[in-house]
């Protein structure tokens, strides 16, 4: 039986659905690797050198298409265990997400392919103002994985993380 994280609850009327995000930190006792994501639709673009990423065993950058068919970028960092992901990876994760994210060389804790953790911020009328902004506004720690997810804000990013992990759970239950 699949433990699907994409849950919906009825709101004020039967036609309204409310998104319920997954827990930010969860451990099902599994040890994941990049091979577990082959059937999810995730396409690996780069494998990062993790020599300077304390405790990480591997890290990857890639994309998955959303429900509209548009590619969205994700970063996956793997650790030996869930405890390592939490205890060694959290400070690196917090450093690059959200409103206080550090996406410049002078303050980022891990510089490997830093440019892939940024995007140009949009201005009025969908014009680009050329200001660098963090690509990932949230992350989840799922078993031994830290998953960084794109989004316009923390809630949008968490929804993308939940959908991503839900696809993993669905593919592993088949």
How does the language model describe each region?
Residues 25, 29, 77-80, 153-156:
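Extracytoplasmic/periplasmic, Sec-exported soluble proteins
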Residues 1-10:
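Sec-dependent bacterial lipoprotein signal peptides
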Residues 13-66, 158-174:
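N-terminal "mature-domain start" segment
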């Amino acid at each position: 039986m699949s433990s699907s994280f994409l849950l919906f609850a009825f709101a004020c009327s039967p036609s309204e659905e409310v998104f319920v995000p997954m827990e930010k930190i969860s451990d099902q006792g599994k040890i994941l690797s990049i091979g577990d994501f082959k059937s999810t639709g995730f396409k690996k673009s780069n494998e990062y050198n993790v020599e300077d990423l304390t405790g990480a065993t591997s890290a990857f950058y890639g994309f998955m298409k959303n429900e509209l068919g548009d590619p969205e970028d994700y970063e996956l960092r793997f650790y030996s265990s869930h405890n390592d992901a939490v205890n060694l990876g959290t400070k690196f994760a917090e450093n690059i997400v959200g409103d206080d994210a550090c996406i410049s060389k002078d303050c980022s804790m891990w510089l490997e392919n830093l440019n892939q953790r940024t995007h140009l911020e949009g201005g009025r009328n969908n014009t680009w103002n050329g200001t660098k902004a963090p690509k990932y506004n949230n992350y989840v720690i799922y078993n031994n994985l830290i998953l960084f997810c794109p989004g316009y804000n923390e809630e949008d990013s968490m929804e993308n993380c939940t959908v991503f992990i839900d696809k993993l759970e669905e593919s592993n239950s088949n």
